[in-house]
Design a protein with these regions (language model features):
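Bacterial N-terminal signal peptides that target proteins for export
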Residues: 1-2
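Sequence signature of WD/YWTD-type beta-propeller architectures
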Residues: 14-274
C-alpha cells in the first residue's frame, strides 16, 4: 500500500483543478453502490450496484432517489441525451434458445416513459446516445468504431491485436479517449490519427471538458484493490490527485464543475471543482 501511495504522490504534481468541496451524497450511498453516470448538466446522478443491476436517479438539488429500472446490466455504459432528459441503457435477457441477449431501452426521465429500441442485441457495448448526433463512438467487442452521418468506420490507433475499452467522444466531438488493456490511456483524433499517450494508470477515464480527463489510479495486490485515487490529467501532460489517500475512490464521472464517484464501502461522493 505504501508503494502504491508513493506512485500516486509522485504523479500528482500539477494544479489543474481547485477542489472546492468534497461531500458524501448520503441518499446515494448504500451497500455495493456504484455511480453509473452524471447528467451533462450535472443536475442528477445515476446509481447502480457492483453488478450493474438497476438504475436509480439521484437529484442533486433535492436529494430525492427515484428508481428508473431494475433491469440486469442497466448500469453499464449508460448514454445520455445532450439535455439529460433521456438516457439509453441495456436490459439483459435470456432468449428461448437459452442464450443471453441485450434489449436496448430508451427512457424519458421527464415523462417517465420507456421503449425498447433494439431487441436481442449480442454486442455488449454498442449503445448510441439519443438525440440528433452526427458522430457517434461505438466501443464494441474491445474494438472502436465511429459512425459519422450513417457511415461506420473501424478505428484502431494502436493496431488490431489489442483490446480497446472505456472509449468516449470528447464534448466537442473532435477527439476519442480510450484505454488499451495492459498499455494505458490514449487520446486520438476522430479519424484515429495523432494518437497521444496519457498515462498507464489513467483507468476508467472520462472527459471533464475538451482539455481535462478525470480517471482513477487504482492499485491492487493481485486479488483486491488496496488504494485508488481520483485523478485529473491534461492533454499537455499535467497530472493532479483530487482525493485524499484515506479514500479508496473509484469509477468517477464528471460534468462541468462536478466529479462524482463511489468507494469500496458503497459511499458516494460529490467533488465540486473549478
Amino acid at each position: 500500500m505504501l508503494v502504491a501511495a508513493c506512485v500516486v504522490s509522485m504523479l500528482a504534481s500539477a494544479q489543474i483543478l481547485d477542489v472546492v468541496s468534497v461531500n458524501e451524497l448520503k441518499g446515494a450511498s448504500f451497500q455495493d453502490a456504484r455511480v453509473a453516470g452524471i447528467s451533462p448538466k450535472g443536475d442528477y446522478v445515476l446509481m447502480t450496484n457492483g453488478s450493474n443491476q438497476g438504475l436509480q436517479r439521484y437529484d442533486l438539488a433535492t436529494g430525492e432517489m427515484t428508481v428508473v429500472t431494475n433491469a440486469e446490466g442497466a448500469g453499464f455504459n449508460v448514454q445520455f441525451s445532450q439535455d439529460g432528459k433521456e438516457i439509453v441503457f441495456r436490459e439483459r435477457t435470456t432468449g428461448e434458445d437459452k442464450l443471453r441477449y441485450n434489449n436496448i431501452v430508451r427512457a424519458n426521465l421527464v415523462e417517465q416513459k420507456q421503449e425498447v429500441i433494439a431487441k436481442k442485441q449480442t454486442n455488449h457495448d454498442m449503445l448510441v446516445a439519443p438525440g440528433n448526433i452526427n458522430i457517434t463512438l461505438q466501443n464494441s467487442e474491445c474494438m472502436m468504431h465511429i459512425v459519422k452521418n450513417g457511415k461506420r468506420i473501424h478505428i484502431a490507433p494502436q493496431g488490431n491485436d489489442v483490446n480497446y475499452i472505456w472509449a468516449s467522444l470528447s464534448p466537442n466531438k473532435k477527439k476519442i479517449l480510450y484505454y488499451v488493456s495492459e498499455y494505458g490511456c490514449y487520446v486520438c483524433d476522430v479519424d484515429g490519427r495523432n494518437s497521444q499517450f496519457i498515462g498507464e494508470d489513467c483507468r476508467a477515464p472520462q472527459w471533464y471538458n475538451n482539455e481535462i480527463i478525470i480517471s482513477m489510479n487504482d492499485q491492487d495486490d493481485g486479488h483486491f484493490t488496496q488504494t485508488s485515487a481520483i485523478m485529473a490529467y491534461t492533454l499537455d501532460g499535467k497530472v493532479q490527485i483530487l482525493t485524499s489517500p484515506d479514500m479508496v475512490a473509484m469509477y468517477p464521472f464528471a460534468a462541468e464543475g462536478k466529479v462524482v464517484f463511489s468507494t469500496l464501502q458503497g459511499k458516494t461522493y460529490l467533488l465540486e471543482v473549478k
